[in-house]
Amino acid sequence: MLGFKDKIIESHIELYGDPDSKTNNQYSFFFFSKIEFKENDIFQIYAKTAESRIRAGWLFPVSVLGSREHDFWENPHFSVYAKIGGGILTSYTGDDLSEDTHILILKDATIAEYDIYVENTAVSLLKHGYYPIVNGAKFHNSLCTIDNNETKNISVEKHPEISSHIPYIPKLVQEFLPKTTDPLSRFISIYQVYELLMEKYFHYKIDEYRALRATIGTIREKISDLSSEKKLIQGVFSHCKLRNNIDENERALAKNLFGTDKDDAYYKGLQLQSLIYDIRNAIIHNYHKYELSDLMRDIAERMEIILFETLENSQVSALLAKAPAPQPYNSR
């Protein structure tokens, strides 16, 4: 009996002829898992830079390589990549492909010219529900979706500062999130990013005061102002101009979690920075008090969406990459 990959290859040959693997060395490919999808989930990938938006490749379910039951069957641009995909499948020796597998094919010349690689664009795909396949593990976030009825394109942006300045973040998005299914573990690992950002912000502010040649007394006073985690996360949100208003789903999550422990004024004035911090406190200090086991998946899924939004923020990248050069202390 033919396995999944062999069935696709057999059908592919009937549709496109024998695969030509000679052109494969001009392209890079990556496999992703996405559990809930439609066969029509075929997207052109565009590399988004400060100056332009360039078509870099295609992303589609592996299953469409052996099918004509989709909208792109007669698209000449897709056909080129479908034939390349057939060659990739023919030479691929792994046994980790399944009906949930999607393939991203990028033209090497384009990604080299614009420095667009999976390693520095992972967030742009994760937020749509495409997780790297890690040791066969698969995770599905019901909030990470993209509707092919609304768009046929996915734009990817590079975030090199994130990879080079905080190694934990690429490890989180490329390895930990794809294979970890426990929502509590996911939340804790996601919140670590905000703790890292708070640490970065703290040192950024201290270096800023030093650059201004502030006195030690002034610096001590400023350190005291930055001593609490609540003030630090407020500082991160303000400095990076992150979204602070909450949507109705986030407000509903807060009400489901805290109930009557918080009054109407709290829910009415709730900001995102406070929601994140308060959820963290509830989990760390009062896990036994709230019905967190029933809410943890919703909490983790929404925190993941917020995390991706944070990592795509240009001010976050700037915070990670830049800080004033240290100056000698003025002891007077």
Regions found by a protein language model. Name each.
Residues 152-332:
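Amphipathic, oligomerization/interface secondary-structure segments
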Residues 1-182, 196, 297-301, 305-332:
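Charged, non-catalytic interaction/linker regions at domain boundaries
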